[in-house]
Amino acid sequence: MFNLRIAEKSDAPMLAAHNCAMAFETENKSLDPAVATLGAEGLFQRPELGFYLIAETDSIAAATLLVTYEWSDWRNGLFWWIQSVYVKPAYRRQGVYSKMYKHLKELALSQPTPVCGFRLYAETDNQAAQATYKNLGMHACEYVMFEESVV
């Protein structure tokens, strides 16, 4: 059984560890743990940017994800971007992400600012993640993502 809760600032080191594990596993990237911790802590200093959701079992953080906000002037509502999804290997294929996703839907419906949808991106070769997202009702978009670092 998984209990869900919104993360608190004291969770930042664990969130950073999950982010480091996820980056290494999915992209073979080694994140600087100090920077990852500052990144997690930074969200708690600016809650208007989003929140983390944690799934726990027996006081162990089995899974975490980050939600950030994007305003859509076309829809007069927010898209919730689901990011930094990490489920510890021992808890995979047990429905934890599905439970988290369903909980996000419930949260979205209760917000004072309308949430018009969820978005996320997945590595192109991460077929397992893509299958999970499709099984929950998501579909691939017709957009191509571009990026340029400014720091």
Q: Model-flagged regions — what are they?
A:
Residues 42-54:
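A short helix-loop-beta-strand connector motif used in the catalytic cores of GNAT acetyltransferases and
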Residues 85-92:
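A short, internal acetyl-CoA/4′-phosphopantetheine-binding micro-motif in the GNAT/acyltransferase core
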Residues 98, 124-142:
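Conserved active-site alpha-helix within GNAT-family acetyltransferase domains
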Residues 114-129, 147-151:
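Conserved beta-strand-loop-alpha-helix junction that forms the acyl-donor binding cleft
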Residues 88, 99-116:
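Conserved acyl-CoA
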